[in-house]
Amino acid sequence: EEYTEWYGGTFLDKKLHEQAVYGLPEFFRDKIKGKKLIANPGCYTTCSPLAIAPAIANGLVSTKGIICDCKSGVTGAGRKPTQGNHFPELNEGFHAYKVACHRHTPEIEQTLSKLSGEDVTITFVPHLLPVNRGILATVYADINEGVTFEQIRNCLLYTSDAADDKA
């Protein structure tokens, strides 16, 4: 099972898991209305799709070769002390971690696949910054032929409208 592969565990209550609905309201509002159990996406699994979904949903960019280049503050790395989030290692520097094996990869791909109706695979590169809080997703995609910069700009400026129109 994919969950076991990426998270290294199993569901405590499989029945509850089967009842859960994925809860990114910007895109799946109708699916979560009235539900009792909503699976809440985390940091990267929220910011990455929000950055590119309007362009994908409106057919402006290719769903192939998407790169999610993300940065987060050290608090996003969890509470467990590790070499990578130890102050002397992180202070005045930053680094990529879990490149090509981060557990949020399939969740981002799942969201973008649902929005596009195609199988989307991404290259996801998270970075840890020496700041207490914050997150940034810069997402790269090839612009489809005939699409203008103005179309991309307008789509991303009016994210909620664009997402609501297609998602």
Residue ranges and their predicted role:
Residues 83-86, 118-142:
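Active-site-proximal loop/hinge segments within enzyme catalytic domains
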Residues 61, 92, 103, 117, ...:
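Short gly/pro-enriched beta-turn/loop segments at secondary-structure junctions
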Residues 1-92, 97, 117:
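N-terminal Rossmann-like NAD(P) cofactor-binding subdomain of oxidoreductases
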Residues 105-124:
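Oxyanion-binding "anion nests"
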Residues 158-167:
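Single conserved hydrophobic/aromatic residue that forms the stacking wall/gate
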Residues 42-45, 69-76, 101, 126-132, ...:
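Glycine-rich beta-alpha junction loops
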Residues 145-153:
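Short, conserved charged micro-motifs
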